[in-house]
Regions:
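Short, charged, solvent-exposed linker or helix-capping segments at domain edges/interfaces
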Residues: 94-99
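Non-catalytic interaction-recognition regions
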Residues: 1-93, 107-585
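A short, compositionally biased domain-edge/stem linker segment
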Residues: 101-106
Length: 585
């Protein structure tokens, strides 16, 4: 289905053309004065200069050319040259009837849909997920769903931090704590144990202890570097121990991400890119892009059009060590071979904007990707506490992600118990649904690039622009439909008879347009803005229109069909945001 706004443009473009003006001036927008009209066209104002006519003359000429049109119940030219438009009730009902029957409620696949690698998550193994990992996971999961909704083949890759010094630190600490382990015995030739010699809790204790110790103990730090070297050069014991670290960590990560309703298609990491580094470096060198700078191998990426300095991208340090840029470029080589994507999207903290700008420029200059491959980075803002600083525990430490989820769920559970509207059997699942809505909507309703304040009281409120308010609207519609008790599939959506009904129908008609905006801009906040407007219109409609006591059966069936369509659209949209609605609240 075409967007309603595009259908309006087709009518206005034809009228502008018939009146002797360029059709492009027929673009319409939502009215910023809904008390006067629903849509408006300012094309006459823009055309006045080109055609040396007063805007109101042009507007009147276009209005005459438009004539009687079934799309509009009213069209008028007003000073200084606006065209004010109201959609015909019959046309609006017809549009929604078609929308209700169409796949995806009329939203169509992007004609340019392609294969997209979406790189999000990015946790380090052997470390617990904390609140700093929340935004990448939540935004990434939503974008993955939105991209797929419009027909793209999306590969979600977690890109684990599973290589480097952190591994050597853990191994050196383990060697001191458990010296009898066979992994550190150079003479050991047998099979290594199938079970890991540690739990996830032990791992999460060992790493920070080792990291702190390395800053005080030079000999220990040197041993950690030696263990890292041995791992990266394929020593049998270190490799076996590393596999245990990876397995135990990934099992815990999967449990935590599953608890958040986030999933990944590919669980690869920095380690998987290592074998592609020589090939990548050879390609970059062959292009003549590398220069030596103080013993390091770098690629200058500054361009004449840059307003500020963009430093060279360092590929190999003077001591031979590689960096994140090296790994990211090698990962691109790997992904090109495995997936042949037409688009890459990376989600990280916005402090990495420069890093990705450097990486993308090297990838293009070296021909690691084709000239028309899209390379994109979304740098997200910080989740802050009410003090405006990065969110912490009450003790001032970094809060674990599972602690945050538990805190939000407990808070929501206590609110549900106060209302006593849910049975004990349904309580855990209902609380989880509402907690996820509070947490995810609270994040996603903000522009990804902006910082936001985490406010549990506000995010979990059942009123206002919140996830629980959206869920409340869906659950209330389900309750009304259950009381109505008849199938709505065969009901005819009739033209609106009240302002509240028409407003709800107008908002419904904009679903595809709103979701396309979210897709085009990689901005889930556009989905949130849309469903808040839709939920508000729905609540006003069923508050002012007595659906269950309506005596006219045909009209009542139409009301039921309308709110059922609203429910379906809302549920489609919250699925794109990564949460779902309970049966009761």
């Amino acid at each position: 289905m075409k967007f309603l706004i595009d259908l309006i443009f087709e009518q206005l473009a034809g009228a502008f053309e018939r009146a002797g003006f360029d059709a492009a001036y027929g673009k319409a927008t939502l009215s910023n004065r809904p008390d006067l009209c629903e849509y408006q066209c300012n094309g006459a104002l823009a055309a006045a200069k080109q055609y040396h006519k007063a805007p109101i003359q042009i507007a009147n000429a276009v209005l005459d050319a438009l004539g009687e049109n079934e799309m509009f119940s009213s069209a008028e030219a007003v000073m200084p040259g606006f065209l004010n438009l109201k959609i015909s009730e019959d046309y609006l009902a017809s549009y929604l009837r078609e929308m209700a029957q169409a796949p995806h409620y009329g939203a169509q696949d992007d004609p340019a849909a392609c294969t997209i690698v979406l790189d999000y998550g990015g946790p380090n193994v052997a470390k617990p997920l904390h609140v700093g990992h929340l935004r990448s996971a939540i935004i990434g999961e939503s974008l993955k769903r939105i991209y797929r909704f419009f027909g793209n083949h999306v590969i979600g890759d977690i890109h684990l931090g599973d290589w480097g010094l952190q591994m050597g630190l853990i191994m050196a600490q383990l060697q001191d704590e458990k010296p009898g382990l066979p992994y550190f015995d150079p003479d050991y030739t047998g099979e290594y144990p199938a079970e890991a010699p540690f739990t996830i809790s032990e791992l999460e204790r060992i790493y920070p202890a080792a990291s702190a110790r390395s800053k005080e103990d030079e000999a220990f730090a040197a041993r950690a570097h030696e263990e890292t070297f041995r791992l990266q050069h394929g020593e049998r014991g270190e490799r076996a121990l590393w596999q245990h670290i990876l397995r135990v960590s990934v099992e815990d990560l999967k449990r935590n991400y599953d608890n958040l309703g986030v999933s990944f298609d590919v669980w690869l990491g920095e380690s998987d890119a290592q074998k592609y580094i020589p090939q990548m470096l050879e390609t970059v060198k062959a292009r003549g892009l590398c220069v030596e700078s103080e013993g390091a191998l770098v690629v200058p990426v500054q361009e004449e059009t840059d307003a500020k300095e963009v430093p060279p991208c360092i590929l190999v340090k003077s001591d031979g060590a590689t960096l994140y840029a090296t790994t990211d470029l090698a990962t691109i080589v790997q992904r090109e071979q495995d997936y042949h994507p037409q688009k890459y999207m990376y989600l990280t903290d916005k402090r990495q904007n420069l890093h990705f700008e450097q990486v993308f420029r090297v990838a293009k200059k070296a021909g690691l990707v084709s000239a028309d491959t899209q390379l994109g980075h979304i740098g997200f803002g910080t989740m802050n506490g009410k003090d405006g600083k990065p969110f912490k525990t009450r003790a001032g430490g970094v809060m674990r992600l599972e602690t945050l989820i538990a805190d939000v769920t407990d808070y929501v559970t206590s609110k549900i118990k106060e209302n006593q509207t849910v049975s004990d059997e349904e309580l855990p699942q209902t609380a989880k649904c509402i907690a996820m809505a509070a947490l995810k909507y609270g994040d996603l309703s903000n522009l990804p690039t902006k910082d936001y304040v985490f406010d549990l009281d506000r995010f979990s409120s059942f009123e206002g622009n919140t996830g629980p308010y959206i869920l409340y609207t869906i659950v209330r519609i389900k309750s009304i439909l259950a009381k109505y008790g008849k199938p709505v599939s065969g009901a005819q959506l009739l033209p609106p008879e009240s302002a509240e009904q028409k407003q709800l129908m107008l908002v419904l008609s904009r679903m595809s347009d709103a979701l396309w905006t979210a897709y085009r801009d990689s901005a889930p906040n556009a989905v949130c803005a849309y469903i808040y407007e839709l939920a508000t219109a729905a609540n006003k409609f069923y508050h002012d229109v007595k659906i269950l006591t309506e005596p006219d059966e045909r009209r009542q069936a139409s009301y039921a069909a309308l709110i059922d369509l609203t429910r379906g659209v809302l549920e489609t949209c919250i699925d794109l945001l990564g949460f779902s609605a309970p049966e009761r609240m």
